[in-house]
């Protein structure tokens, strides 16, 4: 059975959802530490201190605060990302004058991934806003920035809607876009470049699970090294906006540099780098294998 664009899009969307699920289940505790250290750099002396204090204050469940919105965020983001990635690859082929079935270069794949990420950011921003607020709720309450309240996904969603309406879910959209668009150029570029290295003349589709995971991990490292300061600014905007203060990208950046120094923009980098390999490796492994399985089932029909 010959694939059509709608079926191909559905396969990419489903495979992206599988990849997003694998990414969260693998890396959620490190993501929680990252957001805490980004938002409250003066509160923790480092990753170990953040882990120990989180465990003593909230228990093991503290590492998995925000998992539900993180799952929704990653499933939504990666579903849209990989579905749009397929469409954007076709757009790149058209722009450079290639046949629909022609293989793209690593640079062209990176450009397609960058374009696709702009669409993914629109579904990611609301769910990531809820996730970041849940992850830092304990620190916001104990520091006196907000009053003690229910700490659930639904309570956070209701509070955002009550205070700011539907547009309130898009606090930090500009910084999310500024992170996603260049970041995913390096993400897909690093992934495809690494796959080309491991394939060394063979088809990339023949790579086993270990090279795929290493390639995904390398792509994740490339992404975070390129845009980490922007992610730090985004976390600040999304978390601190629950106090009622609305600060934009430039003002938040200038405030951090002026009051805390440039190094504050890299708070939480260590857990992010530790998380990058297993989480993004699992993402691409789940994506590639589930996509391959669905494509083989389709061709057998």
Curated annotation (Swiss-Prot):
Repeat Solcar: residue ranges?
7-91, 104-197, 207-293
Regarding the membrane, this protein is recorded as:
Multi-pass membrane protein
Q: Indicate where this protein resides in the cell.
A: Mitochondrion inner membrane; Mitochondrion membrane
- List, alphabetically, the Pfam families matched: Mito_carr (PF00153)
Tissue pattern of expression reads: Expressed in the liver (at protein level).
Q: Does the keyword Transmembrane helix apply?
A: yes
The reactions it catalyses are:
L-citrulline(in) + L-ornithine(out) + H(+)(in) = L-citrulline(out) + L-ornithine(in) + H(+)(out); L-ornithine(in) + L-arginine(out) = L-ornithine(out) + L-arginine(in); L-ornithine(out) + L-lysine(in) = L-ornithine(in) + L-lysine(out); L-ornithine(out) + H(+)(in) = L-ornithine(in) + H(+)(out)
Q: Example GO biological process term? A: L-arginine transmembrane transport
One GO cellular component term: mitochondrion
GO molecular function list: antiporter activity; L-arginine transmembrane transporter activity; L-lysine transmembrane transporter activity; L-ornithine transmembrane transporter activity
Instruction: State which residue ranges cross the membrane.
Output: 5-25, 68-88, 110-130, 168-188, 207-227, 237-257
How activity is controlled: the entry says: Inhibited by pyridoxal 5'-phosphate as well as by mercurials (mersalyl, p-chloromercuribenzene sulfonate, and mercuric chloride), N-ethylmaleimide and spermine.
- Sorted UniProt keywords: Antiport, Membrane, Mitochondrion, Mitochondrion inner membrane, Repeat, Transmembrane, Transmembrane helix, Transport
SUPFAM superfamilies linked = Mitochondrial carrier (SSF103506)
State what this protein does. Answer: Mitochondrial ornithine-citrulline antiporter. Catalyzes the exchange between cytosolic ornithine and mitochondrial citrulline plus an H(+), the proton compensates the positive charge of ornithine thus leading to an electroneutral transport. Plays a crucial role in the urea cycle, by connecting the cytosolic and the intramitochondrial reactions of the urea cycle. Lysine and arginine are also transported by the antiport mechanism. In addition, catalyzes an electroneutral exchange of ornithine or lysine for H(+), a reaction driven by the pH gradient across the inner membrane.
So what family is this one in? Belongs to the mitochondrial carrier (TC 2.A.29) family.
Task: Give the protein name, as stated in the record.
Answer: Mitochondrial ornithine transporter 1
**Lineage, uppermost ranks:** Eukaryota, Metazoa, Chordata, Craniata, Vertebrata
> Its gene?
Slc25a15
